[in-house]
UniProtKB/Swiss-Prot annotation:
The keyword Oxidoreductase does not apply. FMRFamides and FMRFamide-like peptides are neuropeptides. The modification Leucine amide is found at residue 9. This is Extended FMRFamide-3. Its main location: secreted. Keywords: Amidation, Neuropeptide, Secreted. GO terms for biological process: neuropeptide signaling pathway. It comes from Austrophasma rawsonvillense (Gladiator). One of its GO terms (cellular component) is extracellular region.
Length: 9
């Protein structure tokens, strides 16, 4: 979802 890039932090 759109949060995927955030979770990669």
């Amino acid at each position: 979802g759109p949060d995927s890039s955030f979770l990669r932090l």
